[in-house]
């Protein structure tokens, strides 16, 4: 911050939400328009869920993508020699077979209670082949979705604040990401490859009075267009040396 380094203990997703709300409530000039970016990273590797959702989806089997066991026979050799398969390349940290070293005692107790019994059962099972891939996929996708659940909570809190403060009808909300992601598609996690699952990403806009709720626009947009769009909406001239367009 402008005042120096500030250390906050907690789950990063919750902290980002809390800091955003604190600025909206206490940090802005309420007589002026505002612009705030609330940027979450939890769904990024290594998909570390917060204490609230450590056991969410336990006892549920997530449907596997049809291409989870893709053999890449119709692709170039590079597709089969990459290092991002669920079968071979998820680390013990990715799979939560090791307890993170950055937890408080209270967080560690909750973590061990959630993952300890399941990890013990996995080690005893000595899975191989398709069964091992199935287990890894379930661990990966559930942790990913646990992270997303916390992000959903945070976004919901921000939208609720806008409603409660009568700001929703005069505020543009834009929800997006930096890229798509493989959730077991082609047997992969991560991004890297320009297939549809990685190339496409969400761009959801709530603009009361301008964009009809539920509408779909199929024009192509890139994330290098975002800054120009923000400037245009704010009535600020767009520098000629910026790429992209509003």
Give the positions of each predicted feature.
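A conditional alpha-helix N-cap/helix-loop micro-motif detector
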Residues: 13-17
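Generic recognition of well-ordered alpha-helical segments
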Residues: 19, 200, 222-233, 246
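Active-site-proximal cap/lid insertion segments
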Residues: 2-12, 24-32, 37-221, 233-242
């Amino acid at each position: 911050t402008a005042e120096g380094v500030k250390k906050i203990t907690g789950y990063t997703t919750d902290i980002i939400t809390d800091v955003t709300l604190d600025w909206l409530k206490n940090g802005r000039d309420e007589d002026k328009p505002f612009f705030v970016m609330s940027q979450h990273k939890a769904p990024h590797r290594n998909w570390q869920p917060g204490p609230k959702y450590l056991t969410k989806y336990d006892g549920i089997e997530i449907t596997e993508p049809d291409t989870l066991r893709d053999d890449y026979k119709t692709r170039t050799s590079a597709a089969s020699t990459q290092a991002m398969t669920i079968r071979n390349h998820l680390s013990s940290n990715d799979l939560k077979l090791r307890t993170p070293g950055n937890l408080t005692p209270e967080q560690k107790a909750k973590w061990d209670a959630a993952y300890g019994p399941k990890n013990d059962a996995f080690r005893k099972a000595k899975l191989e082949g398709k069964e091992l891939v199935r287990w890894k996929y379930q661990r990966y996708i559930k942790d990913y979705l646990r992270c997303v659940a916390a992000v959903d909570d945070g976004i919901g809190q921000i939208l609720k604040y806008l409603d409660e403060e009568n700001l929703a009808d005069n505020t543009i909300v834009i929800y997006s990401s930096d890229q798509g992601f493989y959730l077991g598609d082609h047997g992969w996690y991560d991004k890297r490859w320009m297939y549809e699952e990685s190339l496409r990403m969400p761009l959801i806009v709530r603009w009361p009075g301008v964009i009809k709720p539920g509408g779909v626009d199929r024009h192509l947009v890139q994330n290098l267009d975002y800054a120009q769009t923000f400037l245009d909406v704010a009535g600020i001239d767009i520098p000629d040396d910026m790429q992209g367009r509003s």
